[in-house]
Amino acid sequence: MAALGQERADGVTHRRNRSRTYRACERIDALHAAPVSGRSGSVGTVTTAIEVEDLSKSYGDLRAVDGVSFSVEPGEVFAILGPNGAGKSTTVEILEGHRRRDSGRVSVLGVDPTEGGRAFRNRIGIVLQEAGVDKELTVRETLDLYSTAYTRRRSIEEVIEMVELADKLDERISRLSGGQQRRVDLALGVIGTPDVLFLDEPTTGFDPAARRRSWELVRDLAGNGTTIVLTTHYLEEAEELADHLIVMAGGIIVAAGTPESLRDQAGEATIIRFALPSVDASLAGLLDPLHGDASGRDRRLEISTTKPTADLAHITGWALQHGIELDGLSVESVTLEDVYLRLVGTDS
């Protein structure tokens, strides 16, 4: 009897979850069925995939986005970086048509996202941090259910091969690992053959090998003309994938360009990092002759220098003179992460 009661309880939970999923799809269908507004009544062909001019959005007294402007070309991977509260999510939600702006001009695929209707929504894909799918459905059932929201769609077989889950097609979502569930989210984002794909932390939960395979998928999509807007906290991911990027902080853009140009803005500096066993009065003898700027926390020191050979010789000579071992000594070129942390702070 207890087992029967549990089975009935599981059945009720399953039906509730399935009901929530169907209601979610009904909302999607309702959005897609909304009339297309604008003079042409359809999404036109444009040379720029996304244009944003002087975009602003406030929540009460909080200015979440303050006069942001940028553009994205077709087939480009465009990354939006920044700490929590920088305005990234609000900006992306406005681009997706899920939030109204207070002022400024926004064009995605030639239309205002809030007025694009079904023609617009059939041309974008969205991979949220959490898709909220019914985990009691199988992968096949989930893809089949969500594909009905799109008028032009890839086959389930094609999509499942793209995300490398062919052997899990008839597995329940609940039985997949976190990384595999994230790949299902990615499959849902591309099943509608989007012209613009929004990726919000797409590789969270992936192991390093799976993350790199997903990068190849993103490159393939972009290479075939899909415009991709990427938000990620993995700076290596942005450096690897982005053609152009912006860094936001406090609702404004604090840096913009290619990953290479942002590194160049930091100069040709080399980063020397190491840890001291202790900090004492003799430290001045280490830092004073250096050509670069020093920063640190606790025992960790970081030297940003344009003369790495001379400074490294001085640092190691000082350490030998004092009989000190420099733990974790490394010499590295400036990375996008270094530039990012200088822009937004190490506590972000």
What are these model-derived regions, one by one?
Residues 13-15, 31, 232, 290, ...:
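Intrinsically disordered, low-complexity cationic segments
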Residues 25, 38-40, 308-348:
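C-terminal coupling/interaction segments
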